[in-house]
Regions:
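Eukaryote-skewed repeat-based solenoidal scaffolds used as protein-protein interaction platforms
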Residues: 138-190, 194-199
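Acidic, small-residue rich beta-repeat scaffolds with periodic aromatic anchors
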Residues: 24-76, 172, 177-284
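Repeat-based blade/solenoid architectures
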Residues: 72-91, 142-152, 202-208, 277-280
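Short beta-strand elements that form the blades of beta-propeller/WD-repeat-like
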Residues: 104-110, 161-169, 222-230
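Bacterial N-terminal signal peptides that target proteins for export
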Residues: 1-10
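Bacterial N-terminal signal peptides
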Residues: 9-18
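A glycine-rich, hydrophobic loop/mini-helix early in the fold
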Residues: 103-157
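Structural signature of eukaryotic scaffold interfaces centered on beta-propeller domains
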Residues: 90-101, 150-160, 213-221
Length: 284
């Protein structure tokens, strides 16, 4: 099956997860040829071409283009791979956000596989569309094969600021790997807060799932604290298996990120999620 078709089918399968609750009202997948709300002079394709200059419709419901503009990886210069020489996708995820008290528009483009990395290549672009559209920033945010916004997609961390939540994932027959970057915008530039690593598996005797919840907590600092809770649940199956099923169990692992004025970044109050990631690696 062609890679881009597989990604399209996977995206359809993940829609219930990606569009749950508040996410259904915030992320959209407009036709790229359509104009922005309240505008007649700018299309989403116009915005997309600021990061993929030769992007054009193939007349069959997809948009094809060559190399994107140069950009950094959100996790730093030692992360990520090269972009594909050509890419094809049906649409892009669009998310209105607040940054620095201003209205901004984020768009997420999954370009497919990287030619020199196991990770894919996904562009997160930031636009000012209040007047003449302007690309403010763009970064590769892929940290696994397929990349999306993750519900709730954004989280308010101040009266005029939102944190963005993306996810990169891949699956095999019994395991699901998910990495969730938390990204803020400062001075119209994306900054990585942290990445949350979770791991699901479904075996004959049991299934184990790790769900993630996010909460902002006002604490009197320039940006609100962000509490991340991973609920790690094990559910025994009713199947007849060689191995005895474990007992049902559930535990919450939480970390709160506080804004540190001295370092001008978010700092975790514990290494609990890092320890969970290390535990998960032993089960791969």
């Amino acid at each position: 099956m062609p890679t881009n078709l597989f990604r399209f089918i996977l995206a359809l399968m993940l829609l219930p997860l990606l569009w749950t609750g508040a996410g259904a009202q915030t992320v959209s997948f407009p036709e790229l040829s359509s104009t922005l709300p309240g505008r007649t002079d700018v299309t989403y394709l116009d915005l997309a071409k600021t990061v993929i200059p030769d992007l054009a419709s193939d007349g069959q419901g997809f948009y094809k283009g060559g190399l994107p503009i140069e950009m950094r990886h959100i996790a730093g210069p030692d992360s990520g791979g090269s972009p594909p020489e050509t890419s094809s996708f049906p649409n892009a995820a669009v998310l209105p956000i607040k940054a620095g008290g201003k209205d901004r528009l984020a768009m997420l483009f999954d370009l497919g596989d990287s030619p020199d990395s196991a990770e894919g290549y996904a562009i997160l672009a930031l636009y000012d569309v209040t007047a003449k559209p302007k690309l403010l920033d763009a970064a590769n945010v892929a940290v696994d094969r397929s990349t999306y916004f993750r519900e709730p997609n954004k989280l308010s961390i101040g009266a005029g600021d939102d944190m963005l939540i993306t996810m990169s994932t891949h699956f095999n027959s019994s395991q699901g790997y998910v990495i969730t970057p938390l990204i803020m915008v400062r001075d119209d530039r994306f900054e990585l807060i942290d990445m949350i690593y979770t791991f699901d598996e479904r075996l004959c005797a049991y299934s184990r799932k790790q769900d993630v919840a996010f909460q902002s907590i006002a604490d009197g600092r320039p940006y609100a604290a962000v509490k991340v809770t991973v609920t790690d649940s094990t559910v025994p199956s009713d199947e007849s298996c060689d191995d005895a099923p474990p007992e049902a169990s559930s535990r919450d692992i939480s970390v709160t990120y506080h804004w540190d004025k001295k370092t001008s970044r978010y700092v975790a109050d514990s290494d609990a999620l890092a320890k969970l990631s290390a535990e998960n690696e032993k089960r791969f």
